[in-house]
């Protein structure tokens, strides 16, 4: 990740950490791993969706326009999603279905792991 992406990700993590620290999940406290699974799972799914758009040839501007229409999304989270879009479009568009599927899976996994690694560091003292 680039410096601006790291700064944006830290803001995202701080917001999510604040939400997680007061959250109650199904009448029991959410554990650190539960929080990581929920938040980073959502990031992975979003990254998969964006990379799928990339691999089918959708224009980056369309993805940005859809993101900009999200009125209820907090700005730091929206900015982080924008960085995911930028990162996806820095990757090549593949011509074969097999390579496209691999690119989608690898990108989703990469974004999930980036999120999980950052949360592990930020939440190290909790639980």
What do the predicted segments below correspond to?
Residues 58-127:
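Compact alpha-helical subdomains of small soluble proteins
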Residues 26-67:
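N-terminal secretory signal peptides
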Residues 5-15:
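Sec-dependent signal peptide recognition
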Residues 21-23:
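N-terminal signal peptide c-region/cleavage motif recognized by signal peptidases
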């Amino acid at each position: 990740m680039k410096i601006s992406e790291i700064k944006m990700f830290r803001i995202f993590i701080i917001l999510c950490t604040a939400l997680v620290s007061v959250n109650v999940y199904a009448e029991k406290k959410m554990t650190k791993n539960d929080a990581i699974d929920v938040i980073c799972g959502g990031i992975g799914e979003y990254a998969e969706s964006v990379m799928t758009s990339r691999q089918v040839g959708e224009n980056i501007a369309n993805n940005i326009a859809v993101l900009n229409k999200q009125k209820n999304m907090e700005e730091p989270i929206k900015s982080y999603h924008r960085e995911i879009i930028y990162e996806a479009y820095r990757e090549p568009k593949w011509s074969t279905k097999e390579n496209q599927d691999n690119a989608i899976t690898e990108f989703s996994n990469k974004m999930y792991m980036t999120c999980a690694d950052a949360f592990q560091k930020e939440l190290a003292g909790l639980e």
